[in-house]
Structures are given as structure tokens and as C-alpha cells.
A protein has these predicted regions:
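N-terminal low-complexity, intrinsically disordered segments
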Residues: 1-92, 205
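Intrinsic disorder/low-complexity polar-acidic segments
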Residues: 69-206
Length: 206
């Protein structure tokens, strides 16, 4: 699987703040799925996407090295507007994954914001960079030629058991398909294997 990571940690880049809430929709807010695992069954995103439900369950389990802060999933389909996000994203994926447009008319994507539980790792950019190097190297070996893993290192501020500044990782899985069903299946399989990889000894022992 094609895998890469970048950093968006400049002074103008957004900071992930946890806990968070949507000012326009107070009912939409951070849920600590480590403490409230049964709330997974009631999240709109997980009700629609079983693969996302399973990934969140695995990543917030007691033996996981990370926990999650935000997530979303969405289809990527052709738009009549040549400047539309979906068209640009489809072109980008086809170019990087090496598939022609007639074979891959659609795609599916998701993101999950991750935070390392270990406070020393959470606060260290250097350790995050080492972990992201390791994760992208391991993910390349996964057999998902239609899928792409993108990781973005971001600044974070967490105030759950006392305030702390550190870093978060936005994990994107994007997958092309011959049709909507195959794109969705390719995405789900890739997401599942990346979640499993994150819970392997390579990262739990970090």
C-alpha cells in the first residue's frame, strides 16, 4: 500500500484541541471512547460504516497505544465542476496509485485523528516522526494496491487529566474502485489492516 507522512506544525497550522465541541451543534462533541466504548454504537459515522466502527473499537481498546479524537468517512465521486475537491482528489489518487480513470471512476476515504497515550511520546515531535517513519515502512508491505495511507503530524492540546501540549496524527485512508461498492470494500480492508498494524508489538512497545 502506498504510504507517506507529512507535518503541518507551522505557526499558522490548526491545532487539534481535546476535548472539543462543535459551536453550531452542541450535541456533536468529543467522546472518550476508552471510557465510553458503548457510545461507538451510537455515532452516526460508525452506524453507516462498520469498518470504521471496528477500527475505532480496536484503536481505543485497552492495549492500544493510541486513542481517537475525531473521525469521518465520505465517498469521492466525479463532479461536473472541474475545480471540485472530488475531481482533484480522484486525479491525485489515480496519479499516485497508477490506475486510469476508466478503471477507477470513484473512491472512498476516511480520516481518524489519533493521539498517543504515552505522555512522553505525545509531547515529543521527534518520537512521533520516528513512529511515522516506522508506520509508513510497515504499511508499504500491506497488499492494497488500490489504497493509500496518508499521515499528517499536527500540534495538539489535550486537557483531560491536566493540560498538555503535544502532537496528534491524522490518519487518512483513501481507496479507488471500479465502482462504489469496490471502492468501499477496498477502503474498509485497508483501514482494518492499518488499525491492526498500529496495535502490533512494533507500536505497543514503542
Amino acid at each position: 500500500m502506498l504510504s507517506d507522512w507529512t507535518a503541518e506544525c507551522g505557526p499558522e497550522d490548526p491545532v487539534l484541541v481535546v476535548p472539543w465541541s462543535d459551536p453550531d451543534k452542541p450535541e456533536v462533541h468529543f467522546i472518550d471512547l476508552r471510557e465510553h466504548p458503548y457510545d461507538l454504537d451510537h455515532l452516526p459515522e460508525t452506524e453507516r460504516h462498520p469498518a470504521l466502527l471496528n477500527a475505532l473499537r480496536a484503536l481505543n481498546a485497552s492495549r492500544s497505544p493510541v486513542f481517537t479524537a475525531k473521525c469521518d468517512a465520505w465517498p469521492i465521486e466525479h463532479s461536473p465542476d472541474p475545480e471540485d475537491y472530488c475531481n482533484n482528489e480522484l486525479t491525485y489518487l489515480r496519479l499516485n496509485l497508477g490506475y486510469p480513470s476508466e478503471e477507477t471512476p470513484v473512491a472512498f476515504a476516511s480520516y481518524i485523528d489519533l493521539l498517543w497515550r504515552d505522555r512522553t511520546i505525545f509531547a515529543s515531535r521527534h518520537q512521533h516522526e520516528q513512529l511515522l517513519d516506522r508506520l509508513t515502512r510497515r504499511a508499504v508491505a500491506l497488499d492494497h494496491s488500490y489504497a493509500m495511507l496518508e499521515l499528517v503530524l499536527r500540534p495538539a492540546f489535550v486537557d483531560l487529566n491536566g493540560p498538555q501540549e503535544g502532537f496528534a496524527v491524522s490518519l487518512y485512508i483513501k481507496a479507488l474502485g471500479h465502482d462504489s461498492e469496490s471502492a468501499y470494500e477496498n477502503w474498509g480492508r485497508a483501514l482494518s489492516e492499518v488499525a491492526t498494524l498500529l496495535r502490533s508489538k512494533t507500536f505497543t512497545a514503542a
